[in-house]
């Protein structure tokens, strides 16, 4: 991922490829070197339908379960106490995607994780929040979409609409990039093979029906 070269970066690939970890590492580096003033962690809370009012606790506590992978990476790099201090000072900010509307984010490093679960409208809204001196990293796995049936993924649409724009980079990870337990790579590859075979079987069935109709 050319995060240092581009203002907007998409990292697309299966679970365990280090997309989120790499994004957080780059955010921490930019913060330590004072290239940006703050880090924003954003993730769509699909399970809660972006309506977090029914959950107990304040905003940070409500969105925490959905941002746990981002927190884990931050704690590993900076330590728990430092991360908590930076959150208290709003140097690190945690926000559900729905709360980004109407904001302009200048001199910030913004990470949108699990972006496959954004709608097209949400993705457009997020991308148009980015202000002067800011870098955005959008990560997602198009094989793990949890949106309601019939809802188009904002990540899939963005990869088609924005692919030819300068200063926007798309990096695609594969099962070979998996950095978790070796079994995760095999699991990803097995599911990919299953999906390919399923599509092939459907296509063969369609061809068979067409041939029968011709006869």
Which residues does each PLM region occupy?
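Conserved helicase motor core of SF1/SF2 NTP-dependent helicases
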Residues: 2-112, 116-212
């Amino acid at each position: 991922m050319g995060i240092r070269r581009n203002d907007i970066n998409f990292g697309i690939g299966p679970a365990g490829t280090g997309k989120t970890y790499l994004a957080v590492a780059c955010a921490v580096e930019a913060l330590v070197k004072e290239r940006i003033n703050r880090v924003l962690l954003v993730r769509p809370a699909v399970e809660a339908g972006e309506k977090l009012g029914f959950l107990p606790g304040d905003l940070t506590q409500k969105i925490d379960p959905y941002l746990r992978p981002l927190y884990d990476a931050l704690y590993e790099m900076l330590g728990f106490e430092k991360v908590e201090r930076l959150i208290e000072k709003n140097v690190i900010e945690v926000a559900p995607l729905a709360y980004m509307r109407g904001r302009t984010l200048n001199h910030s490093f913004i990470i949108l994780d699990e972006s496959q679960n954004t709608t097209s409208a949400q993705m457009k809204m997020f991308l148009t929040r980015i202000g002067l001196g800011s870098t955005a990293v959008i990560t997602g796995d198009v094989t793990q979409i949890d949106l309601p049936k019939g809802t188009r993924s904002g990540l899939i649409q963005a990869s088609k609409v924005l692919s030819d724009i300068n200063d926007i980079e798309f990096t695609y990870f594969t099962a070979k990039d998996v950095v978790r337990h070796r079994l995760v790579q095999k699991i990803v590859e097995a599911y990919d093979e299953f999906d390919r075979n399923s599509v092939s079987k459907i296509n063969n069935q369609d061809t068979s029906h067409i041939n029968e109709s011709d006869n």
